[in-house]
Amino acid sequence: MSARKILILNGHPGQTSLSKSLCAAYQAAAEENGHQMRCHDISQMQFDMDYGQGGYENPKPLEPDLAQFLEDLEWAEHVVMAAPLWWGAVPAKLKAVFDRALLPGRAFDTRNVSFMGLPAPMLTGKTARVLLTSDTPALWLRLFYGNAVKKFISRQILGFVGIKPTRFSTFAPATDAPEAKVKTWLAAAGGLGAKAA
């Protein structure tokens, strides 16, 4: 496999987390296999989370961390995002990254609208992998919640701007997981990184 350009986004706002460890395992294996990496960690990113009232007509200027994230997103061929499932969705700060950074003219084109009324995506030709940690078992997420968070991420965020397909790896239940189980999860993340999958 030829080297790929990979963007990793750790979407857990804590300084230490399973999400961060999964990102590190993925990154280490990807680098060992010659893939190019750019990494962002929302616990280190500084920006105003409030989208504000300006809308797309008068958006807030992107802070340096968001501007760099968007530049790296445009550069990447493959996007890896790790995040915990909190109250059925991703953490607010991670959602704010997309609220603020995915702007018209860079992520989607409102001047070019489909017959369904949707703007043309501008980040096409990219794929994604989401490393989702949760205390809700994967079967429960699918049968009782209809994989709502997966649809939200893959269709309403990444797919909307052209990043597809998005594949998911779910690690659950995460809280108080035995050390041996965590090791298997980290190995799985490393296996994905080695293949840039």
Q: Which positions does each model-derived feature cover?
A:
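Cofactor-binding loop segments of dinucleotide-utilizing enzymes, especially the Rossmann-like FAD-
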Residues: 11, 42, 133
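N-terminal beta-loop-helix "entrance" segment that forms/cooperates
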Residues: 42-61, 180-182
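Glycine-rich phosphate/pyrophosphate-binding loop and the adjoining helix
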Residues: 140-197
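A short beta-strand-loop structural module common to alpha/beta enzyme folds
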Residues: 35-46, 169-172
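N-terminal beta1-alpha1 ligand-phosphate binding loop
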Residues: 2-35
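Short, glycine/charged-enriched secondary-structure capping and boundary segments
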Residues: 21-24, 52-55, 94-97, 143-146, ...
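Helix-loop-strand module that forms the ligand-binding subsite of alpha/beta enzymes
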Residues: 61-153
